[in-house]
Amino acid sequence: QIFNQTKCDGVKIEGNAELVDVIKYLTKKNIPVMAHVGLQPQKFSSASKFKIYGRKEDDLKNILNDCKALEKAGAISLLLEGILTEIATQITFASKIPTIGIGASEYCDGQILVSEDMLGMFTEYHPKFVKKYANLCSNIQNAIKRFSSEVNNNKFPNKKFRYD
């Protein structure tokens, strides 16, 4: 009911093969599911716990098996985050559904970045795979400082910005 009321196009769920039953249930209800594998930031409270997926010996086998299971369960696409290039490439070529990469190489079918990261909204930690296309944090801070200064120095508001 909520899905229909919000008019969203689908849901994204972080996890691995443990999600198979959830994905099957949702797809039976005609709710498209994007499965998010690899680095799963919503599961961590601290950026220091982020780790790149694929450095352990069993990672390749595990994630390939997870992706096959998620695809078979009905996922419409796979979001691959923070995964080594070799693994992301193998997943992309093995999958019948699109792969979307965020820190998973140019070999995925599509790419995404978190808007706040690519727009430079944060000055703290950001993953290696984030390219900043702007520095809005600095621009916003400067705008607020200018506003505050103009208010404190009685330069704003002025005649230009009032109704007489």
What are these regions (language model features)?
Residues Q1-D164:
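Alpha/beta enzyme core
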